[in-house]
Protein backbone atom coordinates (compact mmCIF):
# COMPACT_ATOMS: atom_id res chain seq x y z
CA UNK A 1 0.00 0.00 0.00
CA UNK A 2 1.23 3.50 -0.80
CA UNK A 3 0.08 7.07 -0.69
CA UNK A 4 -0.39 10.08 -2.94
CA UNK A 5 2.43 12.50 -2.28
CA UNK A 6 1.84 15.05 -5.05
CA UNK A 7 -0.88 15.77 -7.63
CA UNK A 8 -0.21 17.65 -10.87
CA UNK A 9 -2.33 18.86 -13.75
CA UNK A 10 -1.23 20.32 -17.07
CA UNK A 11 -3.44 23.25 -18.01
CA UNK A 12 -1.48 24.45 -21.06
CA UNK A 13 0.57 22.31 -23.46
CA UNK A 14 4.35 22.46 -22.81
CA UNK A 15 3.93 24.59 -19.67
CA UNK A 16 4.99 23.43 -16.19
CA UNK A 17 2.59 21.18 -14.33
CA UNK A 18 0.41 22.87 -11.70
CA UNK A 19 0.44 21.22 -8.28
CA UNK A 20 -2.95 20.62 -6.65
CA UNK A 21 -3.91 19.63 -3.10
CA UNK A 22 -6.92 17.76 -4.48
CA UNK A 23 -8.34 17.15 -7.91
CA UNK A 24 -11.56 15.89 -9.44
CA UNK A 25 -11.10 12.79 -11.57
CA UNK A 26 -13.49 12.12 -14.46
CA UNK A 27 -14.34 8.57 -15.55
CA UNK A 28 -12.73 7.61 -18.87
CA UNK A 29 -11.05 11.01 -19.18
CA UNK A 30 -8.58 11.86 -16.41
CA UNK A 31 -7.95 14.88 -14.23
CA UNK A 32 -10.47 17.69 -14.65
CA UNK A 33 -8.84 20.52 -16.57
CA UNK A 34 -5.75 18.55 -17.57
CA UNK A 35 -5.12 18.80 -21.30
CA UNK A 36 -3.64 15.30 -21.46
CA UNK A 37 -6.85 13.50 -20.45
CA UNK A 38 -8.89 12.20 -23.37
CA UNK A 39 -11.93 9.91 -23.49
CA UNK A 40 -10.99 6.40 -24.57
CA UNK A 41 -7.26 6.97 -24.08
CA UNK A 42 -5.08 4.50 -22.22
CA UNK A 43 -2.92 7.46 -21.13
CA UNK A 44 -5.40 9.41 -18.97
CA UNK A 45 -3.32 9.55 -15.77
CA UNK A 46 0.40 8.95 -15.22
CA UNK A 47 2.06 7.82 -12.00
CA UNK A 48 5.68 7.77 -10.88
CA UNK A 49 7.08 6.82 -7.50
CA UNK A 50 8.96 9.28 -5.31
CA UNK A 51 11.70 6.71 -4.85
CA UNK A 52 12.55 6.86 -8.58
CA UNK A 53 12.51 10.66 -8.60
CA UNK A 54 14.87 10.71 -5.62
CA UNK A 55 17.17 8.14 -7.27
CA UNK A 56 17.65 10.48 -10.24
CA UNK A 57 17.64 13.73 -8.25
CA UNK A 58 14.37 14.96 -9.78
CA UNK A 59 11.71 17.15 -8.20
CA UNK A 60 8.08 15.96 -8.19
CA UNK A 61 6.22 17.13 -11.31
CA UNK A 62 9.29 17.73 -13.44
CA UNK A 63 8.76 14.58 -15.56
CA UNK A 64 5.10 15.59 -16.09
CA UNK A 65 3.49 12.90 -13.94
CA UNK A 66 -0.04 13.44 -12.64
CA UNK A 67 0.53 11.54 -9.40
CA UNK A 68 3.73 11.15 -7.41
CA UNK A 69 3.42 8.12 -5.14
CA UNK A 70 5.29 7.04 -2.04
CA UNK A 71 5.64 3.56 -0.60
CA UNK A 72 4.17 1.43 -3.40
CA UNK A 73 6.52 -0.98 -5.15
CA UNK A 74 6.06 -0.29 -8.86
CA UNK A 75 7.91 -3.52 -9.70
CA UNK A 76 4.98 -5.52 -8.28
CA UNK A 77 2.39 -3.76 -10.47
CA UNK A 78 1.21 -5.06 -13.84
CA UNK A 79 -0.95 -4.08 -16.77
CA UNK A 80 -4.57 -4.70 -15.81
CA UNK A 81 -4.13 -4.08 -12.08
CA UNK A 82 -6.87 -1.93 -10.61
CA UNK A 83 -5.72 0.72 -8.16
CA UNK A 84 -7.93 2.50 -5.65
CA UNK A 85 -6.54 6.00 -5.26
CA UNK A 86 -8.63 8.06 -2.87
CA UNK A 87 -12.18 7.16 -3.88
CA UNK A 88 -11.28 6.62 -7.55
CA UNK A 89 -10.40 3.40 -9.32
CA UNK A 90 -7.84 3.33 -12.14
CA UNK A 91 -6.69 0.51 -14.38
CA UNK A 92 -3.00 0.26 -15.22
CA UNK A 93 -2.83 0.22 -19.03
CA UNK A 94 0.92 0.11 -19.54
CA UNK A 95 4.32 1.48 -18.68
CA UNK A 96 5.02 5.16 -19.28
CA UNK A 97 7.91 5.19 -21.71
CA UNK A 98 10.18 8.21 -21.31
CA UNK A 99 9.96 10.57 -24.28
CA UNK A 100 12.69 12.72 -25.83
CA UNK A 101 11.52 15.67 -23.71
CA UNK A 102 13.21 14.01 -20.74
CA UNK A 103 16.52 15.04 -22.34
CA UNK A 104 15.31 18.67 -22.16
CA UNK A 105 15.30 18.27 -18.37
CA UNK A 106 18.77 16.72 -18.32
CA UNK A 107 20.74 15.24 -21.20
CA UNK A 108 20.64 11.44 -21.02
CA UNK A 109 17.59 11.33 -18.74
CA UNK A 110 15.41 9.62 -21.35
CA UNK A 111 17.74 6.63 -21.41
CA UNK A 112 18.24 6.67 -17.63
CA UNK A 113 14.48 6.51 -17.03
CA UNK A 114 13.86 3.68 -19.52
CA UNK A 115 11.86 1.03 -17.66
CA UNK A 116 11.49 3.29 -14.61
CA UNK A 117 9.20 6.11 -15.80
CA UNK A 118 6.12 4.75 -14.01
CA UNK A 119 2.69 3.65 -15.18
CA UNK A 120 -0.17 4.93 -17.31
CA UNK A 121 -3.78 4.47 -16.25
CA UNK A 122 -7.33 4.99 -17.40
CA UNK A 123 -10.04 6.08 -14.99
CA UNK A 124 -12.62 3.38 -14.25
CA UNK A 125 -14.45 5.12 -11.37
CA UNK A 126 -14.60 8.90 -10.93
CA UNK A 127 -14.08 10.75 -7.69
CA UNK A 128 -11.63 13.02 -5.93
CA UNK A 129 -7.98 12.45 -5.07
CA UNK A 130 -6.20 14.36 -2.31
CA UNK A 131 -2.58 14.55 -1.22
CA UNK A 132 -2.05 11.88 1.42
CA UNK A 133 -4.75 9.53 0.06
CA UNK A 134 -3.98 5.82 0.18
CA UNK A 135 -3.17 3.82 -2.93
CA UNK A 136 -3.97 0.13 -2.95
CA UNK A 137 -4.21 -2.63 -5.52
CA UNK A 138 -7.85 -3.77 -5.44
CA UNK A 139 -7.70 -6.31 -8.27
CA UNK A 140 -4.90 -8.18 -9.93
CA UNK A 141 -4.67 -8.17 -13.71
CA UNK A 142 -6.42 -11.54 -14.09
CA UNK A 143 -9.29 -10.43 -11.80
CA UNK A 144 -10.12 -7.32 -13.83
CA UNK A 145 -13.13 -8.33 -15.93
CA UNK A 146 -13.40 -4.88 -17.55
CA UNK A 147 -10.05 -5.24 -19.29
CA UNK A 148 -10.90 -5.85 -22.94
CA UNK A 149 -7.74 -7.75 -23.77
CA UNK A 150 -7.80 -9.97 -20.67
CA UNK A 151 -8.38 -13.20 -22.60
CA UNK A 152 -5.39 -12.49 -24.81
CA UNK A 153 -3.17 -11.97 -21.76
CA UNK A 154 -4.41 -15.11 -20.02
CA UNK A 155 -4.05 -17.35 -23.08
CA UNK A 156 -0.88 -15.81 -24.44
Pin down the residues of each PLM region.
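Electropositive, beta-rich accessory/interaction domains or terminal extensions
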Residues: 1-101, 128, 138-156
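A conserved acidic, glycine/proline-rich C-terminal tail/linker
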Residues: 102-123
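Compact mixed alphabeta submodule
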Residues: 117, 124-138
Amino acid sequence: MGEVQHLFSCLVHRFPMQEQDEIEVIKDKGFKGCIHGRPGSKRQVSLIDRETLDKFGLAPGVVKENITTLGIDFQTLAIGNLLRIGNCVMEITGPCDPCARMDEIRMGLQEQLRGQRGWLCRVMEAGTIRRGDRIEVVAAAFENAETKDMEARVSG
